[in-house]
From Swiss-Prot:
The gene is hisB. InterPro entries: IGPD_sf (IPR038494), ImidazoleglycerolP_deHydtase (IPR000807), ImidazoleglycerP_deHydtase_CS (IPR020565), Ribosomal_Su5_D2-typ_SF (IPR020568). GO terms for biological process: L-histidine biosynthetic process. The keyword Isomerase does not apply. Belongs to the imidazoleglycerol-phosphate dehydratase family. This is Imidazoleglycerol-phosphate dehydratase. GO terms for molecular function: imidazoleglycerol-phosphate dehydratase activity. It comes from Trichodesmium erythraeum (strain IMS101). SUPFAM superfamilies: Ribosomal protein S5 domain 2-like.
Length: 213
């Protein structure tokens, strides 16, 4: 079932622009991942990765980024969550890259500071075409439920590399691992929303002084 069947229609026509959607499938000997997304959505989400905590975080990206997102994944989680977690990041990154196309008219940069109780996380990103991750989350526990907290970094490495995004994630406070991670995903979502929005003063233009991204 396609995202158009499961998720809401776009709000993009406000500027009479094409709907920015993508559908990407990645199948390996370890995982089978499909991502459908609509950048101009309303935050509807279907996430079934076999990793409940990752599903919860994907819902944060969708809800706070106002992206309609459908992620379906089957992987070798009987061995470890690593392959599925990473491949979801890879596929989501590829879908973002596909949906953005030539990146004409986008704001390009995004920045947000998100609190969650005692946790405070700052994210800044740039759809620069130069993939990079600077990661500064320090969780006090190795696991949140059954989820290995090391996998948060692996997810964002995969996403940044495959979306060609420069991404900085910095923790300013926090003592609860769940709160720290969720604040990070919420800050990422709001930064993503900001960066991918269309700037009405630059419609049809590459947001770079070089004229290329």
């Amino acid at each position: 079932m396609q995202i158009s069947d499961r998720l809401s229609s776009s709000t993009a026509p406000i500027l009479n622009l094409p709907v920015r959607r993508a559908s990407v499938k990645r199948k390996t000997g370890e995982t089978d991942v499909t991502v459908n997304l609509n950048l101009d959505g309303v935050g509807n989400c279907q996430a079934n990765t076999g990793i409940p905590f990752l599903d919860h975080m994907l819902h944060q990206i969708s809800s706070h980024g106002l992206i309609d997102l459908d992620v379906q994944a089957v992987g070798d989680i009987e061995i470890d969550d690593h392959h599925t977690n990473e491949d979801v990041g890879i596929t989501l990154g590829q879908a973002l890259k596909q949906a953005l196309g030539d990146r004409k008219g986008i704001v390009r940069f995004g920045h947000f500071l998100a609190p969650l109780d005692e946790a405070l996380v700052e994210v800044a990103l740039d759809f620069s075409g130069r993939p990079h991750l600077s990661y500064g989350l320090e969780m006090p526990t190795q696991r949140v439920g059954n989820y290995d907290t090391q996998l948060v970094r692996e997810f964002f490495v995969a996403l940044a590399n495959n979306s060609l995004m420069t991404l900085h994630i910095r923790q300013l406070g926090g003592i609860n691992s769940h709160h720290i991670i969720e604040a990070g995903f919420k800050a990422f979502a709001r930064s993503l929303r900001m960066a991918t929005e269309i700037d009405p003063r630059r419609v049809g233009e590459i947001p770079s002084s070089k004229g290329v991204l």
